[in-house]
Amino acid sequence: GVDSHPPALPWPHFQWFQGLDWRSVRRGKEVYEQVFAPCHSLSFIKYRHFEAFMSKEEVKNMAASFEVDDDPDEKGEARKRPGKRFDTVVQPYKNEQEARYANNGALPPDLSVITNARHGGVDYIYALLTGYGRPVPGGVQLSTTQWYNPYFHGGIIGMPPPLTDDMIEYEDGTPASVPQMAKDVTCFLEWCSNPWWDERKLLGYKTIATLAVIAVSSGYYNRFLSGLWRSRRLAFRPFNYSK
């Protein structure tokens, strides 16, 4: 077959006592904005969600740089306004028909929950982004608008290789190699799919710790304190009324 299973990688947030790599998440946002945003939407993400790794002022300025649909004016005519924190991230296309027309009939998937929606999750996304350029197996026929990628189902994908070395410049100066950009945008998409990952993980540890304390306390009480009550016996002594 032409399909390959993505290799499992040591993502930090899968470790016991580590969370999301927030520097990587922020860099991944840069990759998304400059490479993937023109085609792929984030329909479940609002600008205020970016405050998880950006300042409120940065988020306000980012939202205001886009125009969104506003309520119609007194004449009923449509109008625009600068975006605000509570607005959904601006979508690249107005509707599905426009998206398909711009992509040779294919509908670019929304990336809001892509790591949850694809088998293999982050491993699949990273493998897909770095899987171009492999030798095409015999029997696989490609048109001029198709590419071979062993990690895509069927091996034939309509999306051209999205990443090339040094195609962007990171704000923090990190070298923008293909593996680096693939790793960063994958971390960003993992955050989009699971924005409360760290909070849920911390809550899980707190729950485990609380249950452990309750279990130890209950065991101690049962072993050393409740024995006093369990060893007591009630005896019925009838009252002697003759005295």
UniProtKB/Swiss-Prot annotation:
Q: Which reaction does it catalyse?
A: a quinol + 2 Fe(III)-[cytochrome c](out) = a quinone + 2 Fe(II)-[cytochrome c](out) + 2 H(+)(out)
UniProt topological domain (Mitochondrial intermembrane) ranges: 1-201
**Which residue ranges run through the membrane?**
202-221
According to its UniProt record, where is this protein located? Answer: Mitochondrion inner membrane
UniProt domain Cytochrome c: residue ranges: 5-194
Provide the membrane topology annotation.
Answer: Single-pass membrane protein
Pfam families with a match to the protein in the record: Cytochrom_C1
Q: Assign the protein's first listed, main location to one coarse class.
A: mitochondrion
An example of a Gene Ontology cellular component annotation for this protein is:
mitochondrial inner membrane
What is the protein's known function? Component of the ubiquinol-cytochrome c oxidoreductase, a multisubunit transmembrane complex that is part of the mitochondrial electron transport chain which drives oxidative phosphorylation.
Establish whether keyword Heme is in the entry: yes
Q: Which SUPFAM superfamilies match?
A: Cytochrome c, Cytochrome c1 subunit of cytochrome bc1 complex (Ubiquinol-cytochrome c reductase), transmembrane anchor
Look up the record and name the cofactor or cofactors this protein needs. Answer: heme
User: Where, in residue ranges, is this chain on the Mitochondrial matrix side?
Assistant: 222-243
Q: What is the UniProt remark on how the cofactor binds and its stoichiometry?
A: Binds 1 heme group covalently per subunit.
Any idea which GO molecular function terms this record carries?
Answer: heme binding; metal ion binding; ubiquinol-cytochrome-c reductase activity
Q: Report the enzyme's class at the first EC level.
A: translocase
Biological process GO terms, please? mitochondrial electron transport, ubiquinol to cytochrome c
Subunit comment:
Component of the ubiquinol-cytochrome c oxidoreductase (cytochrome b-c1 complex, complex III, CIII), a multisubunit enzyme composed of 3 respiratory subunits cytochrome b, cytochrome c1 and Rieske protein, 2 core protein subunits, and additional low-molecular weight protein subunits. The complex exists as an obligatory dimer and forms supercomplexes (SCs) in the inner mitochondrial membrane with cytochrome c oxidase (complex IV, CIV).
Keywords, ordered alphabetically: Electron transport, Heme, Iron, Membrane, Metal-binding, Mitochondrion, Mitochondrion inner membrane, Respiratory chain, Translocase, Transmembrane, Transmembrane helix, Transport
InterPro entries, A to Z: Cyt_c-like_dom_sf, Cyt_c1, Cyt_c1_TM_anchor_C
What is noted besides the main data?
A: This cytochrome c1 is unusual, its alpha-band exists at 561 nm instead at 553 nm.
> Which EC numbers does the record give?
7.1.1.8
Q: Which family does it belong to?
A: Belongs to the cytochrome c family.
Protein name as it appears in the record: Cytochrome c1, heme protein
Coiled-coil features, chain-numbered ranges: none
